[in-house]
């Protein structure tokens, strides 16, 4: 599984920008502040949220997320659009999501489209399923694959008759779920599952669409995101999310500090946390001069429903007392979080990890080493943003994406021309910033004399 490209329209400060991910397993996004690096992470995270299958989203969920989602729409625009191209097994999917604000200033899904093609050369996209919606429609329109492209049929009433009505699911229920930021394909999969479970007949075309939709939903489930918000919460000793992928389950568990009232875990969660620590400890001591992670547990309550535990994760150095990880440096906390997530892409070809500002709190030499190891051994895909340029010396040209402003538009570029294996890409990038030596990379222009004169003026006025 691999993300191939991403197009963002009216997303924050991006009017219409496309980024291709050429790297086999790693793509690092570099560039000046405000040039659309974090937007890439946020857009894919928004798609993950929209296509989420872990839990149904309701009005309470939307209340907490509404303002955040609305802030992603470019100022002065009525809608945003995200178009993601992702390769899954022998197929490539083109996934499109357009959302905007209705007259009540609420979020509204205007379009949800899925196209599919084979990974074979010369194959072309064909529609799998597409939802079209606006405030004037009594119900959304649904389009499926048509051999004759000139004939476009709305299949919503047919799907309602064949599937929704068979499950006694009303039109109002479907619209409510859509309004609460649930994807149509997740609703479709859920309704088809009920039909199959009850041994009712269903058309083959629906089963084929359902199979592909499940593949897409699982792929988004397998995308993990470490955002700046999560990193900040761990720094504030509020919660530290760790990723897990073991035989029985996969996902994320929030680790709270010892005195947090939410530091309460059942037996299954405790076993998962211990397993994560066991896996991380295979690499952690090798990168921290022998320090290992330990998990201390304490029984909180015993009831008929089971035992609840409070836990404390500690760091134990050779010949030293173990200390709470929250009393360690933010770098040690970040390394633990990062390694728990990296385990997935090291072991699984269907795992994707996105990390915003991966270099924050990580020693630059260690980070460069980790990225070099990952580029050689990662089975999954890593997409990250960063400012520290040292890793550029360890990555190949197809793993380095450079952002800049060109003609007032954010662009995502790669190094052009012939580049020998001995070329230092970090120095090449710095040269482009100083001398404008790369015609496709806009340098960060700093008016140095103006900066110095302004500083002198500021000092005079004190």
Give the ranges of each region predicted by the language model.
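Short, well-ordered strand-loop elements centered on a beta-strand within folded domains, enriched
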Residues: 3-4, 93-122, 140-142, 301-316, ...
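A structural detector for beta-sheet-dominated domains
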Residues: 9, 22, 85-87, 98-100, ...
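Conserved P-loop NTP-binding catalytic core
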Residues: 22, 42-104
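Hydrophobic, Leu/Ile/Phe/Ala-enriched alpha-helical segments that form helix-helix packing faces
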Residues: 44, 48-51, 86, 99-101, ...
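C-terminal intrinsically disordered extensions
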Residues: 120-142, 439-462
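Extended helical coiled-coil dimerization/tether regions that scaffold
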Residues: 250-327, 444-450, 454-462
């Amino acid at each position: 599984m691999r993300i191939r490209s991403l197009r963002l329209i009216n997303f924050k400060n991006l009017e219409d920008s496309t980024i291709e991910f050429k790297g086999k397993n790693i793509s690092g996004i570099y560039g000046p502040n405000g040039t659309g690096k974090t937007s890439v992470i946020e857009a894919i995270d928004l798609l993950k949220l929209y296509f989420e299958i872990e839990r149904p989203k309701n009005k309470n969920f939307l209340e907490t997320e509404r303002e955040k989602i609305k802030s992603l729409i470019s100022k002065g625009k009525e809608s945003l659009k995200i178009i993601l191209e992702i390769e899954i097994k022998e197929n490539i999917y083109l996934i499109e999501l357009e959302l905007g604000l209705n007259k009540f200033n609420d979020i509204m899904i205007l379009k949800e489209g899925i196209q599919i093609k084979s990974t074979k050369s010369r194959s072309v996209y064909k529609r799998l399923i597409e939802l079209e919606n606006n405030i004037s429609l009594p119900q959304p329109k649904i389009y499926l694959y048509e051999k004759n492209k000139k004939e476009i049929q709305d299949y919503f009433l047919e799907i309602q008759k064949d599937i929704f009505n068979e499950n006694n699911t009303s039109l109002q229920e479907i619209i409510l779920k859509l309004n609460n930021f649930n994807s149509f394909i997740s609703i479709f999969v859920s309704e088809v599952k009920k039909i199959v479970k009850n041994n009712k007949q269903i058309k083959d075309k629906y089963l084929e669409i359902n199979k592909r939709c499940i593949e897409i939903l699982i792929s988004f489930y397998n995308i993990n995101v470490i955002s700046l918000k999560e990193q900040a919460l761990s720094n504030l000793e509020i919660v530290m999310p760790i990723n897990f992928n073991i035989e029985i389950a996969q996902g994320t568990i929030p680790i709270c500090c010892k005195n947090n009232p939410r530091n309460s875990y059942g037996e299954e969660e405790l076993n998962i946390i211990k397993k994560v620590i066991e896996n991380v400890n295979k690499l952690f001591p090798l990168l921290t001069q022998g320090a290992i992670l330990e998990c201390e547990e304490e029984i909180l309550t015993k009831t008929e429903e089971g035992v609840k535990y409070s836990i404390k994760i500690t760091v134990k150095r050779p010949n030293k007392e173990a200390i709470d990880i929250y009393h360690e440096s933010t770098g040690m906390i970040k390394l633990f979080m990062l390694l728990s997530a990296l385990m997935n892409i090291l072991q699984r070809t269907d795992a994707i990890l996105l990390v915003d500002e991966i270099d924050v709190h990580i020693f630059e030499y260690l980070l460069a080493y980790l990225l070099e190891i990952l580029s050689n051994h990662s089975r999954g895909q890593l997409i990250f943003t960063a400012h520290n340029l040292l890793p550029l010396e360890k990555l190949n040209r197809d793993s380095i994406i450079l952002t800049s402003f060109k003609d007032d538009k954010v662009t995502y570029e790669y190094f052009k021309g012939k580049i020998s294996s001995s070329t230092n890409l970090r120095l090449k990038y710095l040269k482009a910033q100083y001398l404008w030596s790369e015609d496709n990379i806009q340098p960060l222009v700093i008016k140095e004399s103006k900066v110095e004169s302004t500083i002198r003026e500021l000092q005079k006025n004190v």
